Amino acid sequence: MSVPADTSPAKGPVIAVVGPSGVGKDSLMSGLAVADPRLRSMRRVITRAPEAGGEDYQPVSEAEFQALVEADVFALHWNAHGLRYGIPRDIEKLREGATGVLVNLSRAVLLQAQEVFDDFRVISVTARPEVLAARLAGRGREDAAEVERRLARASLALPEGLRQVHEVDNSGALSAAIVEAQAIIQAERA
């Protein structure tokens, strides 16, 4: 008796894009998605005001977020910087037939994500301290004290125990970082 061929679409990996504030995670993710239409991005749900700007996210109130937690909507959720963040279970639908699904995660939740997602990789985006300082000051979302706190956290190491981690330096031209990240993603697929 022969076993029928598996015709289900392949599931792409979940690719966490991590790094300190101002390093260019969202710009890198956008550039990668433009370069490869099968590389998808997952929007985070955040208890941040909609007018805060920056990344593309789904803003919700604290009460709405808690209701989503209780309804088991999230594959992963965490607290950071006085806000709550969630990755909806819909990420699994995005993985079907995808090169991968990019998601902006906090370094503190990476080990948990590695347990939640069966095919999980990390791209750690870095930049020189002076580049981070200029970018944080330029975006105007944080006051001077918060910029200093974020710069102090920029050098924090990733947690030990992650299986697939790759570093991309985004100190220079964004296009160079995109090419570097594309090469990493393609090499992982080979």
Curated annotation (Swiss-Prot):
<keyword id="KW-0614">Plasmid</keyword>
<comment type="function">
    <text>Catalyzes the phosphorylation of ribose 1,5-bisphosphate to 5-phospho-D-ribosyl alpha-1-diphosphate (PRPP).</text>
</comment>
<comment type="similarity">
    <text>Belongs to the ribose 1,5-bisphosphokinase family.</text>
</comment>
<dbReference type="InterPro" id="IPR008144">
    <property type="entry name" value="Guanylate_kin-like_dom"/>
</dbReference>
<dbReference type="GO" id="GO:0033863">
    <property type="term" value="F:ribose 1,5-bisphosphate phosphokinase activity"/>
</dbReference>
<keyword id="KW-0547">Nucleotide-binding</keyword>
<dbReference type="GO" id="GO:0005829">
    <property type="term" value="C:cytosol"/>
</dbReference>
<dbReference type="GO" id="GO:0019634">
    <property type="term" value="P:organic phosphonate metabolic process"/>
</dbReference>
<protein>
    <recommendedName>
        <fullName>Ribose 1,5-bisphosphate phosphokinase PhnN</fullName>
        <ecNumber>2.7.4.23</ecNumber>
    </recommendedName>
</protein>
<feature type="binding site">
    <location>
        <begin position="19"/>
        <end position="26"/>
    </location>
    <ligand>
        <name>ATP</name>
    </ligand>
</feature>
<dbReference type="InterPro" id="IPR027417">
    <property type="entry name" value="P-loop_NTPase"/>
</dbReference>
<keyword id="KW-0067">ATP-binding</keyword>
<dbReference type="InterPro" id="IPR012699">
    <property type="entry name" value="PhnN"/>
</dbReference>
<dbReference type="InterPro" id="IPR008145">
    <property type="entry name" value="GK/Ca_channel_bsu"/>
</dbReference>
<dbReference type="GO" id="GO:0006015">
    <property type="term" value="P:5-phosphoribose 1-diphosphate biosynthetic process"/>
</dbReference>
<dbReference type="GO" id="GO:0005524">
    <property type="term" value="F:ATP binding"/>
</dbReference>
<keyword id="KW-0808">Transferase</keyword>
<comment type="pathway">
    <text>Metabolic intermediate biosynthesis; 5-phospho-alpha-D-ribose 1-diphosphate biosynthesis; 5-phospho-alpha-D-ribose 1-diphosphate from D-ribose 5-phosphate (route II): step 3/3.</text>
</comment>
